Amino acid sequence: MLNYELELWEKGLLVAGVDEAGRGPLAGPVVAAAVILPPFTEPFIKGDSKKLTKKEREEAYEEIKNKALAVGTAVVDSAVIDRVNILRATKLAMKRALKDLKYHYDIVITDYVKLEGENCMPLVKGDEKSLNCACASIIAKVIRDKIMEIYHKIYPDFNFASNKGYPSKTHLEKVEKGEYTEIHRKSFSPLKKKLF
C-alpha cells in the first residue's frame, strides 16, 4: 500500500491523497476528503473504506485525524450534482478538499480521477494502492454516512440511515412510484425517467 508514497517521500515530496464517497447513490451529496500523512508513515489501517466495518471506519477516522499533518473535506450537494454532472461535482469536491487542507503538498494521488491544475497521479484503485488515498476514502465515507443519518431523521420513509442513498430494493420501489426528496439527484436514472 506504500509503494507510490515511498518513492515520492524519498524524493522529499509531500503527498496528498484524495478520494470521494457518494458518486453512485440516487440521493445525497458527494463528499471528498484530502489527507496528508507525515512522510514514511507505516500503514496503520486495514484498507480503504470498503474493506472496513462501520465501527472500524469510525475508529480509523479518529486515528487518521490524530496522525495526519492535515485533513481537508468538502461536500457538494445534489443540486450541484444535477447542474454540473457527477464527474464535475466530484472534481469540484476534491479540489475544495485540497484547498481545505491549508497545508503545502507537492503531489496528489487520487483514485483514478485526473484533477486539472494539480500535479496529479490518478491511480486505478488508488484507495487500495496509496495509504494517503485510503485514509481519504475513510474520512469521506464516515462524513457522508453521518450526513445521510441526519437526512434519515428528516426523511425516515427512505431509510437513508441504512441505504445511504444507494438504490436498495425498497428505495428503488419508492422512486419507481414517483416518490423522492429534495436531496434526490433528479439527473440520475431512474428519477430522470420519472421526471422528464
UniProtKB/Swiss-Prot annotation:
Key words of the record: Cytoplasm, Endonuclease, Hydrolase, Manganese, Metal-binding, Nuclease
Top-level class of the enzyme under EC nomenclature: hydrolase
GO molecular function, one term: manganese ion binding
EC number: 3.1.26.4
Cofactor notes: Manganese or magnesium. Binds 1 divalent metal ion per monomer in the absence of substrate. May bind a second metal ion after substrate binding.
Database matches in Pfam families: RNase_HII
Chain sites annotated for binding a divalent metal cation: D19, E20, D111
GO process terms (BP): DNA replication, removal of RNA primer; mismatch repair
Domain named RNase H type-2: residues: 13-196
Domain of life: Bacteria
Transmembrane stretches, start-end: none
Places the protein is found: Cytoplasm
Gene Ontology CC terms: cytoplasm; ribonuclease H2 complex
Cofactor: Mn(2+); Mg(2+)
Keyword Metal-binding belongs to the record: yes
InterPro entries: RNase_HII, RNase_HII/HIII, RNase_HII/HIII_dom, RNaseH-like_sf, RNaseH_sf
Reaction equation(s) it catalyzes: Endonucleolytic cleavage to 5'-phosphomonoester
CDD domains, alphabetized: RNase_HII_bacteria_HII_like
Family: Belongs to the RNase HII family.
PANTHER family with a match to the protein in the record: RIBONUCLEASE H2 SUBUNIT A, RIBONUCLEASE HII
Reported function: Endonuclease that specifically degrades the RNA of RNA-DNA hybrids.
Name of the protein in its database record: Ribonuclease HII
Organism, as annotated: Aquifex aeolicus (strain VF5)
